[in-house]
Amino acid sequence: MCSYQSKTKRKEETIMKKLLSILCTGLLLCGAGLTSCENYDNPVTGNAYGNNSIPEGRTISIAALKEKYNDFIDTSKDTYTTIEGETRIEGVITCDDESGNLYKKLVVADETGAIVIGVNATGLYAFCPVGQKVVIDCKGLQIGSYRKQAQIGTVYNNAVGRMPEYVWKQHVRLINEPKLYYSELTPIEITTPAELAAINLKEAPVLVTFKNVKLTEADGIATYAPGDEGSVKRYFTYADGTESGSNLFLYTSAYANFSMEVMPQGSVNITGILLRYNNQWEVVVRTLSDIKRNN
């Protein structure tokens, strides 16, 4: 009798242990499920494009960065150097590659100035459109000139060129969503040659609007850039009849999606990025909507 009771007791203890084991396992799985749900409800914040580990805020303004490396920018030949030490700029994208007129490049500006960023990729506007605020970790990148235009990138053919896209993603952080009310997106209005002359070539790139000008070669037939040419220079006249001259021209790439559009006749406003080409100015419109008729 005692032996039977002892066996029964041991059997009951074994069953209880199994039940406790099952119960504990169930509680653990339930906890894991709750944790999983919590993680799902609280996704990782920050933009998926770029490097969210880059601290917000700049360590130097764009104008100060260009001045610091001016010996490698304002020179008679294309040169470059590597940016050393903690160096971050923060600004707003004022020109992207949406139309293809600015090819594999972006322009970033803060309240002090702007600079060209070379990236060896197309379709950058999908992630880095006009109005997107960015922080760029410049350490390890190269800064220099292309025809005296300040540019950040990496070395190509012994000059500063376009960085690979994976390098760009390591060095850029996107801040919030794109917005079009940043002051950097308000162009400087130019109505006379004197107002253009007041802008120093070292300030390029500059977002500008030429008011009430006429495209000299617009005849109702001529297009911005015929397909048999890589790019075309177009000239215009100011409202007072003054010619833009050889030191100022409208640049259009044959690869721009509006290159075969017929140039408008009459008075127009032309908004674009004023780039330096040695000691000349070239105006690069971002999209066809940057050229607006006045009549």
Describe the function of each predicted region:
Residues I15-C24:
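Bacterial N-terminal signal peptides that target proteins for export
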Residues G33-S36:
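C-terminal motif of bacterial Sec signal peptides marking the signal peptidase cleavage site
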Residues M1-I15:
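Short, Lys/Arg-enriched N-terminal segments with co-localized hydrophobic residues
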Residues E38-Y103, V107-K133, D137-N295:
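OB-fold nucleic-acid-binding modules
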